[in-house]
């Protein structure tokens, strides 16, 4: 068998997320069906991260196995041809060793969360940002973010449906940058809990609205209570940027 590693970009707005689900198209299903149409082989696609419905990706990585040794540029062309009705595209393909695993070989994952912070929304960026009309205090958000860096128990930022065995994660990057009318949050970690990024963003926004002091974020880590934290930020603003191996 030959193992192929692909890098994928997609708009998650009308999709069920990465993982196969009944009744609505997922990225995994779209790509598995596209691969079958050109190869004649049923494959299982393993992704580096399982994004939720509405979440986008710039550099999602996945792998699959085929019995055929095919030219990688032909694989890209074939997948994109059969996936063309959907907002999913493969922009890189390479051979990978048989011990490579898109999920378990990863050492770091990187996300960006986009907030449009102005009085009026955007037609072009609808479903691609979180629009917040009231001004946010970016300096307060930046201060609050420093409490989350490093190794912590992130129970307060974990979805109730999270299946991870441990709430302990190590956040290696959390930068907040204001660019004109947009606020971007850059988050990196070896791995994340379910909804962890969106729950962190939801809490930091309450700091930005001056509902909470920056120091309250530190307390959230200590109380280990999801109900004490902020709301889950909308999926529309979240982008899976890349995975490092």
Swiss-Prot record:
<comment type="subunit">
    <text>Homodimer.</text>
</comment>
<dbReference type="GO" id="GO:0031119">
    <property type="term" value="P:tRNA pseudouridine synthesis"/>
</dbReference>
<dbReference type="InterPro" id="IPR020097">
    <property type="entry name" value="PsdUridine_synth_TruA_a/b_dom"/>
</dbReference>
<dbReference type="InterPro" id="IPR020103">
    <property type="entry name" value="PsdUridine_synth_cat_dom_sf"/>
</dbReference>
<comment type="similarity">
    <text>Belongs to the tRNA pseudouridine synthase TruA family.</text>
</comment>
<dbReference type="Pfam" id="PF01416">
    <property type="entry name" value="PseudoU_synth_1"/>
</dbReference>
<protein>
    <recommendedName>
        <fullName>tRNA pseudouridine synthase A</fullName>
        <ecNumber>5.4.99.12</ecNumber>
    </recommendedName>
</protein>
<comment type="function">
    <text>Formation of pseudouridine at positions 38, 39 and 40 in the anticodon stem and loop of transfer RNAs.</text>
</comment>
<feature type="binding site">
    <location>
        <position position="111"/>
    </location>
    <ligand>
        <name>substrate</name>
    </ligand>
</feature>
<keyword id="KW-0413">Isomerase</keyword>
<dbReference type="GO" id="GO:0003723">
    <property type="term" value="F:RNA binding"/>
</dbReference>
<dbReference type="InterPro" id="IPR020095">
    <property type="entry name" value="PsdUridine_synth_TruA_C"/>
</dbReference>
<dbReference type="InterPro" id="IPR001406">
    <property type="entry name" value="PsdUridine_synth_TruA"/>
</dbReference>
<keyword id="KW-0819">tRNA processing</keyword>
<dbReference type="GO" id="GO:0160147">
    <property type="term" value="F:tRNA pseudouridine(38-40) synthase activity"/>
</dbReference>
<feature type="active site" description="Nucleophile">
    <location>
        <position position="52"/>
    </location>
</feature>
<dbReference type="InterPro" id="IPR020094">
    <property type="entry name" value="TruA/RsuA/RluB/E/F_N"/>
</dbReference>
């Amino acid at each position: 068998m030959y193992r192929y590693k692909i890098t994928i970009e997609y708009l998650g707005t009308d999709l069920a997320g990465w993982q196969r689900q009944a009744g609505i198209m997922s990225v995994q299903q779209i790509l598995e069906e596209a691969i079958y149409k050109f190869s004649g082989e049923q494959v299982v696609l393993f992704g580096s991260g399982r994004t939720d419905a509405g979440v986008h990706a710039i550099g999602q990585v996945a792998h699959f196995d085929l019995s055929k040794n095919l030219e990688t540029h032909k694989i890209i062309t074939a997948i994109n041809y059969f996936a063309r009705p959907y907002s999913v595209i493969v922009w890189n393909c390479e051979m990978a060793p048989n011990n490579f695993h898109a999920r378990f070989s990863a050492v770091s994952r990187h996300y960006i969360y986009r907030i449009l912070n102005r009085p009026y929304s955007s037609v072009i960026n609808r479903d691609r940002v979180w629009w917040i009309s009231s001004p946010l205090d970016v300096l307060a958000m930046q201060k609050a973010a420093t409490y989350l860096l490093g190794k912590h128990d992130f129970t307060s930022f974990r979805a109730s449906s999270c299946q991870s065995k441990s709430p302990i994660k190590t956040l290696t990057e959390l930068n907040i940058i204001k660019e004109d009318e947009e606020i971007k949050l850059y988050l990196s970690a070896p791995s994340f809990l379910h909804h962890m990024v969106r729950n962190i963003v939801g809490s930091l926004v309450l700091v930005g609205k001056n509902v909470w002091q920056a120091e309250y974020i530190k307390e959230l880590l200590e109380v280990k209570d999801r109900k004490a934290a902020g709301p889950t930020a909308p999926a529309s603003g979240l982008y899976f940027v890349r995975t490092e191996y």
